[in-house]
Amino acid sequence: MEQRKYGFFLFINGNCLCRPSGQSCYLVGDKTAFFVCIINFIFFLKGMLVMKKVAIIMGSDSDLPVVRKAVDVLREYEVPFEVHVLSAHRTPEQAKTFATLAAENGFGVMICAAGKAAHLAGAIAANTVLPVIGIPIKASVLDGMDALLSTVQMPAGIPVATVAIDGAANAALLAIQILAVNDAELTSKLVNARAKAARDVLEKDRQISEEFSRQF
């Protein structure tokens, strides 16, 4: 009796699902090959459907009052996150390991908050291809300008998206916008928030206009 053979080629963006490294996969043989391919495909879809986490890393626990603003925004949008303290100078190996394994551990965006020399965002960006957002912290007599310039002046090829000094809320919103590219529900929440902000401004305009128009 002739043995029936199966050949399955499942590719997403040119990469075989059975070989994430990008190698060609030729599953030709018995039915086991079919089920292996299907199982891999199921796990791939599961990974696509689960929302990625946001990593918030601060160089010191003294940055926490600023970082809390980012935490509040992420909670408002129901985006999963983790908060860690890692120093680019005091714990360089741990910071490198965290960045290297970030994608594997389910993170989609990294937010890094640091003051003064503020090398944290750059050190993280050097060890991951995930988007990195830097928050310069006002932590010295230079009112955060030192941290801003340290964070924003990255060499070509290692980008860091830098928000304003102590701009943690915008850092979280930018992280959400990045995740929303593949998430219709998050996109809807962002659109609704923008619409509400516009309505709030117009209502304030109406109130102020009425108040001063009555004075004449």
Feature-to-residue mapping (PLM):
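Glycine-rich phosphate-binding loop
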Residues: 98-136
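Short glycine/serine/threonine-rich phosphate/pyrophosphate-binding segments
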Residues: 63-67, 91-95, 114-123, 142-145, ...
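C-terminal binding/interaction regions
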Residues: 58-65, 69, 145-216
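Short, Lys/Arg-enriched N-terminal segments with co-localized hydrophobic residues
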Residues: 31-50
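N-terminal beta-loop-helix "entrance" segment that forms/cooperates
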Residues: 83-104
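Glycine-rich phosphate/diphosphate-binding loop of Rossmann-like nucleotide-binding domains
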Residues: 52-90
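Cysteine-centered motifs
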Residues: 16-18, 25, 37
